[in-house]
Structure formats: structure tokens, C-alpha cells
Amino acid sequence: MISFLRGPVAHIGLSAAVIDVGGVGMLVQATPKTLGTLRLGQESTLTTAMIVREDSMTLYGFADPDEREVFEILLTVSGIGPRLGLAVLAVLEPETIRVATSTGDGKTFTKVPGIGPKVAGRIVLELAGKLVPHGTVNGAPASPSAQWKPQVVAAMTSLGWSEKDALASVEKATADSPELISDGNVAEILRTTLRWLGQDGARTSAGRQVTARG
């Protein structure tokens, strides 16, 4: 894997730059912010990630290793490809992404063109626990446990539920789990609520069938 590139900047475009590495022009896709730090003819260093496909090999450039790490973790989300992952970094800072995933704030990701509520909710759900804000201790969520309910409700509304239904579902799903409430783990409470909704939906459907038969 090509971990970084260093050399004079030969070209700067709207979405990519060319770095002259030993006489070879390396085309690197990058965010407008990263491209804005480059100057034609000046030597620059870009942290890179190479994405290999059947018909292509593409280099993506980043300001630092932290930005690359967030990019690579974003690509583990189903439906998020390199272009959309780069679009997320074009709009949101790496730390903002870390905080949003750790607190279940799906609305933050809807600021990115091409990401709607469903995709935003999927990002939050699939990246729960994978991106930890740098300001936390021992991987604890950045927000106090006392504030978990608004965060879970926000994540559910980003998945399509109304705020009223989300709040009611959270309360019912956690009613018999005091330890879950005291821990205030947003990701775990969200998973528990979604599981409860699935079971409740099955029970409701079965009840309707019995009523219809009667």
C-alpha cells in the first residue's frame, strides 16, 4: 500500500491533484480543503489510501493519518464507497465524525450531499464503538450518561421514526433494564430499542392474525 506521497505539486484540480514523485505524476483524489493547502511547484506531503477495484486503482489523499483512518472506517459501512466517504470528510471534520458516531447523532451526517436519514442512521448504527472522540477517556462516550435519551431519540428519528414514537419505544425497551439506563451507552440502548421494535412488530402482527381468524 502507498502510505504517503511527497513531491512537488504538478497540478491542482477541483477534486484531485498531481504530485510529481521521482518524475512520475501521481493523481490523488482529495477534499477541497486538502487541495487548498497545496501550492503549484511546492513540495507537499499527502497521507494516502489506495482503493483497488477490478478495473481501477485510485489514490485518495488526506491532510494527516487521522483523516485517513476515519475515511477507511467510513468505508466499512454498507453503501458507503470512497467517493461518498471523501464527501463526508469534505463537509465534516474527523473529530466531528467521531463525536457524531459515539453519541448517535445521525443528523450530523445528513449535512453531507447524498446522505439522507436512512444512510445517516446506518452510519451511526454500524460505526457505534468504532470511532472514539480523542477527548474521551478509556473509550467512554463524549457526552454524560444522563443525556443518552435525546441522543438515542435523535438517532431513531434519523432512521425514520417520529420523535414521539422514538421516545415511547426507548422508554418501553429499557423499562426492564435499569443497568442499561445507568450505563448510558447510547449505541447499546439504540440496539436494544431496535431489537425490541422488531419483536414488538412481530407480536403485533401475530395478534392481528389471531384477531382476524377469530
UniProtKB/Swiss-Prot annotation:
Q: Does the keyword Iron-sulfur apply?
A: no
Annotated keywords: Cytoplasm, DNA damage, DNA recombination, DNA repair, DNA-binding
The terms describing its cellular component in GO are: cytoplasm; Holliday junction helicase complex; Holliday junction resolvase complex
- Signal sequence segment: none
* Subcellular localization(s) per the UniProt record: Cytoplasm
Q: Read off the Pfam families from this record.
A: HHH_5 (PF14520), RuvA_N (PF01330)
Region (Domain II) residue ranges read 64-139
Lineage top rank: taxon: Bacteria
Subunit comment: Homotetramer. Forms an RuvA(8)-RuvB(12)-Holliday junction (HJ) complex. HJ DNA is sandwiched between 2 RuvA tetramers; dsDNA enters through RuvA and exits via RuvB. An RuvB hexamer assembles on each DNA strand where it exits the tetramer. Each RuvB hexamer is contacted by two RuvA subunits (via domain III) on 2 adjacent RuvB subunits; this complex drives branch migration. In the full resolvosome a probable DNA-RuvA(4)-RuvB(12)-RuvC(2) complex forms which resolves the HJ.
> What does this gene product do?
The RuvA-RuvB-RuvC complex processes Holliday junction (HJ) DNA during genetic recombination and DNA repair, while the RuvA-RuvB complex plays an important role in the rescue of blocked DNA replication forks via replication fork reversal (RFR). RuvA specifically binds to HJ cruciform DNA, conferring on it an open structure. The RuvB hexamer acts as an ATP-dependent pump, pulling dsDNA into and through the RuvAB complex. HJ branch migration allows RuvC to scan DNA until it finds its consensus sequence, where it cleaves and resolves the cruciform DNA.
Looking up NCBIfam families in the UniProt record yields: ruvA
Q: What is this protein called?
A: Holliday junction branch migration complex subunit RuvA
Instruction: Please report the organism this UniProt entry assigns to the protein.
Output: Renibacterium salmoninarum (strain ATCC 33209 / DSM 20767 / JCM 11484 / NBRC 15589 / NCIMB 2235)
